[in-house]
């Protein structure tokens, strides 16, 4: 049957990467995998039109992907990339309306079975495709209720106020946004990007929204690191050095153990305050700062590391966590967001949200356990191969197609 994908934002909905297994484009990966099962009519922003049209003829499923472009200005594109720039939503709303008008024209000319609002994953701007007289699918959607404020203790005043304001606005929008309500009501199915989003849809809209994290991976064969059986325990931390990522928790957890044989490798932009913290805690010799490095170099570090230490408390489903699993790397993280759903007890260890100090203690306890039980570490690494298949793009696409079939069977 024909299915119609409608997606955004600029760049990420359309950006083709030469190596799909390391692509940053969530929507592109959805498209190339769904196109193995469906005929896709795709509306997207046009910055990477040349790259899209160059690669389509090289893909076996490319003949099933029909692109329509709704470009925006360079100014709006910059706003899209500048996360936190709320001005973007004004332009995004206009883009969604134009997309709706384009969709109306396509429906007249093409046989369309399903309309799918795929991207962006945020719930705040549901677009207008639900107004079309076609079965409507929305998601995966990120509708987390709020940022965990217990972790604001060490935040700067500006960040503290911004996050509390955002929590308040999120609550208001979940309760009162009429277009969100209309989109949910019209949808034949809404998929949740995380367990927290599932809870929000149940609480505010009284629907069951099946869990389907928004990103996937491409399983690969990686030799398991033999150094896991002895010697130093090498932890890898990768991320943007901002407040959400909570790097201080990782540094303090290492200091809490007072074990010089536990090393923390840190990949991310320069921030002297974090290096200063390591000095104050007398663990500078245990922290290896790699700075900003290439994606390939990150993969090399993952293949050498023993544990991927992910301390973020506010995410969608971070691709870097799936990359860790792809490298047979055990993950320690919070049981929250998409990474909490992606990591199960076979491939990692999760701790609950609590307070910063309790989290430091919990992380330290788990790391010490793994330091002393290398057999557990090795077994979890071996288990990653099965989890790769479960989280693969191929499996994600099949789950979505199953939902399409269910929707059409009810028409």
Task: Give the residues covered by each predicted segment.
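Nucleotide-activated donor-binding/catalytic signature segment of Leloir-type glycosyltransferases, i.e.
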Residues: 59, 275-296
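Donor nucleotide-sugar binding/catalytic pocket of nucleotide-sugar-dependent glycosyltransferases
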Residues: 65-69, 138, 169-224
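Short alpha-helical donor nucleotide-sugar binding micro-motif in glycosyltransferases
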Residues: 184, 292-293, 300-305
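Short hydrophobic beta-strand element within catalytic cores of glycosyltransferases
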Residues: 321, 330-333
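Glycosyltransferase donor-sugar binding loop
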Residues: 238, 263-276, 291
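A conserved mid-protein helix/loop that constitutes part of the nucleotide-sugar donor-binding site
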Residues: 25, 233, 240-256
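Aromatic "clamp/platform" in nucleotide-sugar-dependent glycosyltransferases that forms part
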Residues: 313
